[in-house]
From Swiss-Prot:
One of its GO terms (biological process) is cytoplasmic translation. This is Large ribosomal subunit protein uL6. InterPro entries: Ribosomal_uL6-like (IPR000702), Ribosomal_uL6-like_a/b-dom_sf (IPR036789), Ribosomal_uL6_a/b-dom (IPR020040), Ribosomal_uL6_bac-type (IPR019906), Ribosomal_uL6_CS (IPR002358). NCBIfam families: L6_bact (TIGR03654). Gene3D superfamilies: Ribosomal protein L6, alpha-beta domain. It comes from the Bacteria. It holds the Pfam family Ribosomal_L6. Keywords: Ribonucleoprotein, Ribosomal protein, RNA-binding, rRNA-binding. Part of the 50S ribosomal subunit. This protein binds to the 23S rRNA, and is important in its secondary structure. It is located near the subunit interface in the base of the L7/L12 stalk, and near the tRNA binding site of the peptidyltransferase center. GO terms for cellular component: cytosolic large ribosomal subunit. PANTHER family: 60S/50S RIBOSOMAL PROTEIN L6/L9, LARGE RIBOSOMAL SUBUNIT PROTEIN UL6M.
Length: 177
């Protein structure tokens, strides 16, 4: 059995938490995040900490409480420090550029690919082959990174494509004659 839910989430100074039934809003220097929690979870806010437990009558109460604790901990980290995700473009002529809140990608297609960034996500290009995504919402950062990677996933023979900075692409050997 996981004991994730038994640990409280400590709320640092400068973070404001509002609990309205099952809807929780966390506000900090990097923005404001809102999430609706499962009905099986009971959240208590006291002494600059959030504690979690199951409600009576729900079989999966502890599992849902552990999930809620992990999600809210990520929200607190997001509004205080924020999250970053780095992408690399590997391939001849593969380039990225940022214009406002649009990521412009040249990925070997006959046309450039423009990807509109959602609100709350910022992107920068330290070089033409790198993209750094920043934001407070961990799930949204991962989704945007996955969307950008999906335009040209790393292929298994040369490794060309869009990859996460920490991703290891396994390459295959070419067919022998």
């Amino acid at each position: 059995m996981s004991r994730v839910a038994k640990a409280p989430v400590v709320i640092p100074a400068g973070v404001d938490v509002k609990l309205n039934g099952q809807v929780i809003t966390i506000k900090g220097k990097n923005g404001e995040l809102t999430r609706t929690l499962n009905d099986a979870v009971e959240v208590k806010h006291a002494d600059n900490a959030l504690t979690f437990g199951p409600r009576d009558g729900y079989a999966d109460g502890w599992a849902q409480a552990g999930t809620a604790r992990a999600l809210l901990n990520s929200m607190v980290i997001g509004v205080t420090e924020g999250f970053t995700k780095k992408l690399q473009l590997v391939g001849v002529g593969y380039r990225a550029a940022i214009k406002g809140n649009v990521v412009n990608l040249s990925l070997g297609f006959s046309h450039p690919v423009d990807h509109q960034l959602p609100a709350g996500i910022t992107a920068e290009c330290p070089s033409q082959t790198e993209i750094v995504l920043k934001g407070a919402d961990k799930q949204l950062i991962g989704q945007v990174a996955a969307d950008l990677r999906a335009y040209r996933r790393p292929e298994p023979y040369k490794g060309k494509g869009v990859r996460y900075a920490d991703e290891v692409v396994r390459t295959k050997e070419a067919k022998k004659k």
